[in-house]
């Protein structure tokens, strides 16, 4: 069995009571079968509490006011204190370690939803790289595992990460290339022409970011603008208006995990969008200027944006071996990162043009919790990338 993890993985150590939040609230923690059996046979004074606060039908810990039943007033776990750490379920034992499973391979990451893991990721200045180690385990076989597609995904992911980490190229062009590669990869899979992808991928690799590549992108954007050539349509397709539509598409579809999340989004985004509801008004210049001002005032974002993109691509891209949704996963990586940037700028404006690493950490882990702590949200977000025209290839090129 091979195990892959990012180079900063072993820097993590839980900071317990010093953590600004708790990992035991706002999501339902599923108990694995092995731990469930241990709970069934547990003896001692804690037995009744253990049995009463587990939903045995759903295999989850009960919640009270969105908090795990075993989370006490000091934000510590009563299972840990009363029964010992060996009684943790797999999720609680592993978190914030996240594991993606493939035949003969486990890919481990630190979840962005953990404040300390977010701090470690966002503090990385060097390009992240990944370490693979081998461990002798029983051989496993996954039924219907498409190893040909998986190999293509792995090779392409390496290419995508190289694109993201090419600091000699402006981020806008890196994002364009990222989307273009994923778009063409998806076309090959849709046409059952995966055998052509290696040659196409090599062409993408060789084409670089020169005039030919940029002209193709501009022609794609311009063709879409001509198609929507009325004044109202043109104004509605500015980056500001596109982002507004994207938020309005995503937010109502998401399960709210923590009370106040939607209010938080409104408070963050209103200063950026200036409360302007008229798509034909001249607010675009102010919007662009505010974003440029933030980027100048908080230069760390340049590298943090890169680290976030690598995080999303590393964690989710190769999962397309199970559902073929290659382009949707790359779209999700881009949209999530750009959504975080919008929240950054709104927070910067709301806080009288002040923004620190702590603000960045808070935005990232709160955003991640609402998305990654719910399979429903994660799956729906990805579905929206494929289903809704607002997330078309052309629209994403415009907001990069």
Label each residue range with its predicted role.
Residues 83-187:
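Internal, well-ordered alpha/beta segment that forms a basic, Gly-enriched binding/recognition surface
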Residues 11-29, 62-98, 111-118:
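Local cysteine-cluster metal-coordination motifs and their immediate loop/turn environment
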Residues 4-5, 73, 320-323:
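Short linear interaction motifs
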Residues 11-18, 127-132, 236, 312:
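Short, compositionally biased low-complexity segments
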Residues 14, 82, 146, 150, ...:
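Short, charged/polar micro-motifs that form catalytic or ligand-binding hotspots
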Residues 1-46:
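General N-terminal leader/first-domain-start detector
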Residues 171-400:
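Hydrophobic, aromatic-lined core segments that form the binding pocket/scaffold
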Residues 27-74:
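Membrane helical hairpin/interfacial module
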């Amino acid at each position: 069995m091979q195990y892959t993890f990012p180079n900063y993985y072993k820097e993590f150590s839980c900071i317990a009571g010093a953590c600004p939040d708790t990992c035991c609230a706002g999501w339902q923690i599923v108990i694995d079968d092995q731990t469930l059996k241990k709970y069934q046979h547990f003896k001692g004074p804690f037995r009744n509490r253990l049995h009463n606060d587990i939903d045995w039908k759903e295999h989850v810990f009960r919640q009270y006011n969105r908090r795990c039943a075993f989370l006490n007033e000091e934000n510590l776990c009563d299972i840990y204190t009363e029964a010992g750490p060996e009684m943790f379920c797999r999720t609680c034992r592993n978190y914030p370690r996240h594991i993606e499973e493939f035949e003969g391979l486990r890919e481990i990451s630190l979840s962005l939803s953990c404040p300390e893991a977010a701090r470690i990721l966002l503090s990385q200045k060097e390009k992240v790289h990944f370490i693979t180690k081998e461990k002798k385990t029983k051989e496993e076989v996954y039924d219907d595992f498409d190893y040909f597609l998986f190999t293509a995904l792995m090779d392409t992911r390496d290419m995508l990460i190289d694109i993201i980490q090419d600091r000699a190229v402006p981020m806008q062009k890196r994002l364009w290339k990222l989307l273009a590669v994923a778009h063409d990869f998806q076309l090959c899979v849709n046409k059952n022409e995966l055998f052509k992808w290696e040659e196409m991928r090599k062409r993408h690799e060789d084409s670089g970011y020169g005039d030919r590549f940029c002209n193709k992108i501009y022609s794609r954007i311009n063709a879409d603008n001509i198609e929507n050539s009325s004044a109202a349509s043109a104004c509605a397709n500015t980056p500001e208006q596109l982002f507004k539509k994207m938020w309005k598409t995503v937010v109502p579809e998401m399960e709210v995990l923590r009370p106040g999340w939607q209010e938080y989004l409104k408070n963050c985004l209103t200063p950026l969008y200036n409360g302007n509801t008229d798509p034909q008004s001249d607010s675009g210049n102010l919007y662009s200027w505010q974003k440029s001002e933030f980027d100048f005032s908080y230069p760390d974002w340049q590298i943090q944006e890169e680290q976030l993109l690598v995080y999303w691509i590393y964690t989710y891209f190769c999962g397309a071996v199970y559902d073929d949704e290659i382009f949707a996963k790359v779209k999700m990586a881009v949209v999530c990162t750009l959504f975080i940037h919008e929240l950054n700028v709104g927070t910067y404006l709301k806080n009288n043009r002040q923004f620190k690493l702590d603000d960045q950490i808070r935005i990232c882990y709160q955003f991640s919790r609402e998305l990654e702590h719910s399979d429903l949200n994660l799956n729906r977000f990805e579905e929206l990338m494929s289903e809704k025209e607002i997330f078309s290839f052309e629209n994403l090129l415009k907001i990069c």
